[in-house]
C-alpha cells in the first residue's frame, strides 16, 4: 500500500510573478485556498479504505439535491460546491473530525506539492493541433491534403483501425496532474497560496493540492 497524506481543495485564481531576494523574477500560480470542511471520515472497517471527505465554498440550496442535502445535514456542514476525498493513513484519521476545518497549515513554504486539475477544453480538434502531426505541403502539387491525417491503417488485413489510433476528436477537459511544484508563498490572511510554474485548467477551476509523491 502506498503512502497517503492529507490534501487540500483550492481554486485557481490566475498567474503572477514573484521577485526573489537575488532579484530574479519567477512565474507563480495563485490558488485561492479557503478552509476545507470535513464532511465524512471513511475507515477501512466500514468503507474498505481510510479517507477524509471534504467540501469547500458554498452552493445555493436549490442546487443541492435531497441525498446531498441529507449528507451535509448529517455532518452539520454547510453545503459546498462539491465533495472530494483524500486517502490518508489510518494513523492520521484521529487528526480530523466531522465538521472541523482543514487549513493551509498542512503546507509550508519551500515544500514540493502535486496539483491536479481539469485542463482547458478545446472542443473538436484535428490531428495537427491534437497530436502535433506534421502538415502536408502547402504547394508542389498538393491541393487536397494540407491538414489531412493521412493513412489510418492497411488493407484487408487487418481490415480495421487499431484501437488507440491518433485521430481527430475532442481535445482537453481531462484530469491532469503536475508534480513537484514548489510552494513559494502562503498568505493566510488573504487565503492564497503561490506555487512556482503553471497548473492545469482555467482560472476559477477547482484544483487538488497534495504533498509531492515523488521527490
UniProtKB/Swiss-Prot annotation:
Q: Which positions bear N5-methylglutamine?
A: 156
Report what the Swiss-Prot or TrEMBL entry states about this protein's PTMs: Methylated by PrmB.
- Please indicate if the UniProt record lists Ribonucleoprotein as a keyword: yes
Presence of keyword Metal-binding:
no
Which GO terms fall under biological process for this protein?
translation
Question: Keywords in UniProt for this one?
Answer: Methylation, Ribonucleoprotein, Ribosomal protein, RNA-binding, rRNA-binding
| InterPro entries the record matches | Ribosomal_uL3 (IPR000597), Ribosomal_uL3_bac/org-type (IPR019927), Ribosomal_uL3_CS (IPR019926), Transl_B-barrel_sf (IPR009000)
Q: What Pfam families does the record point to?
A: Ribosomal_L3
Gene Ontology molecular function terms on file:
rRNA binding; structural constituent of ribosome
A single GO cellular-component term on record:
cytosolic large ribosomal subunit
Q: How does it assemble?
A: Part of the 50S ribosomal subunit. Forms a cluster with proteins L14 and L19.
- Into which family does the record put it? Belongs to the universal ribosomal protein uL3 family.
What function is annotated for this protein?
One of the primary rRNA binding proteins, it binds directly near the 3'-end of the 23S rRNA, where it nucleates assembly of the 50S subunit.
Q: Which PANTHER family match?
A: 50S RIBOSOMAL PROTEIN L3, LARGE RIBOSOMAL SUBUNIT PROTEIN UL3C
State the protein's name.
Large ribosomal subunit protein uL3
Amino acid at each position: 500500500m502506498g503512502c497517503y497524506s492529507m490534501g487540500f481543495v483550492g481554486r485557481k485564481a490566475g498567474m503572477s510573478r514573484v521577485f526573489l531576494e537575488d532579484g530574479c523574477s519567477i512565474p507563480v500560480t495563485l490558488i485561492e485556498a479557503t478552509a476545507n470542511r470535513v464532511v465524512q471520515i471513511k475507515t477501512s472497517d466500514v468503507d474498505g479504505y481510510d479517507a477524509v471527505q471534504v467540501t469547500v465554498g458554498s452552493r445555493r440550496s436549490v442546487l443541492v439535491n435531497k441525498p446531498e442535502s441529507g449528507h451535509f445535514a448529517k455532518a452539520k456542514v454547510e453545503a459546498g460546491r462539491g465533495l472530494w476525498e483524500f486517502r490518508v493513513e489510518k494513523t492520521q484519521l484521529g487528526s480530523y473530525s466531522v465538521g472541523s476545518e482543514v487549513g493551509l497549515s498542512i503546507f509550508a513554504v519551500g515544500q514540493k506539492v502535486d496539483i491536479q486539475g481539469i485542463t482547458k477544453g478545446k472542443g473538436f480538434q484535428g490531428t495537427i493541433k491534437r497530436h502535433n502531426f506534421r502538415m502536408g505541403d502547402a504547394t508542389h502539387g498538393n491541393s487536397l491534403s494540407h491538414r489531412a491525417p493521412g493513412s489510418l491503417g492497411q488493407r484487408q488485413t487487418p481490415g480495421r483501425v487499431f484501437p488507440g489510433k491518433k485521430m481527430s476528436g475532442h481535445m482537453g477537459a481531462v484530469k491532469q496532474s503536475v508534480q513537484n511544484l514548489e510552494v513559494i508563498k502562503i498568505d493566510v490572511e488573504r487565503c492564497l497560496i503561490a506555487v512556482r510554474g503553471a497548473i492545469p485548467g482555467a482560472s476559477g477551476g477547482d484544483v487538488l493540492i497534495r504533498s509531492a509523491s515523488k521527490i
